[in-house]
Regions:
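Residue-level recognition of beta-strand microenvironments
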Residues: 83, 123-124, 167-170
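Generic structural motif
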Residues: 73-82, 110-120, 161
């Protein structure tokens, strides 16, 4: 009986990893498109191919970068329950998982907020995970997934700490978790190094 439940659990972990890979592919595709758009916009301003950001996007990007370690959390209250990167599973040591961001446990119906000024680039749905919002901060992107409700629209300009939605509670296990990612171009960043006192 124990082996059967262990098998089911491992299958569930594999399914979660598959879903995480699909999310990563989707995010990369969106970021690729955003970078292409930014380059086109920058070329209209200057024919120099070395500039890839508009002046406004460059200012936002530079400010974002200079706030490493002091960005506000995407929730008023929360605890990091899964960190960035490769880690062994808590129960099955032989099972390794990779997290592209961090998972923050919080209270039911908590509001999610932007960690920095930016523009809503995408709002999309992830099967089994709810809605997700991708915000463009110049060269940087933040991803907020696991939302049941979204307050923003595509193209909206948003300020730091402005509410973007409400976190979803998984009715099967009663978990209320936000999955949060930071990307610099195509490179995944460890969000806990960017958020204020995350370590």
């Amino acid at each position: 009986k124990l082996q059967k439940s262990e098998k089911l659990f491992k299958t569930k972990i594999q399914q979660q990893q598959k879903e995480a890979l699909l999310l990563e592919k989707k995010i990369k595709k969106i970021i690729e498109e955003e970078i292409r758009k930014a380059r086109e916009a920058a070329k209209k301003i200057s024919e120099s191919s070395t500039i890839s950001l508009t002046p406004e996007a460059k200012i936002i990007s530079d400010k974002f970068s200079s706030n490493k370690g002091s960005l506000p959390w995407p929730l008023d209250q929360g605890l990091i329950v899964q960190f960035f990167g490769k880690q062994k599973h808590r129960v099955f040591n032989e099972v390794e998982t990779f997290n592209n961001g961090i998972n923050i446990a919080t209270n039911k119906n908590s509001n999610i907020r932007s960690v920095f000024d930016g523009k809503i680039s995408r709002i999309f749905f992830i099967k089994g995970e709810g809605k997700a919002v991708l915000i463009n901060h110049g060269e940087f992107f933040t991803v907020y997934s696991g939302l049941k409700e979204v307050f923003v629209k595509l193209g909206d300009k948003i300020l730091a700490k402005e509410k973007i939605g409400v976190v979803l509670t998984d009715e099967n296990n009663n978990k209320t978790e936000l999955h949060f990612e930071i990307w610099k171009g195509y490179d995944k960043q460890d969000p806990s190094l960017w958020l204020f006192e995350a370590y």
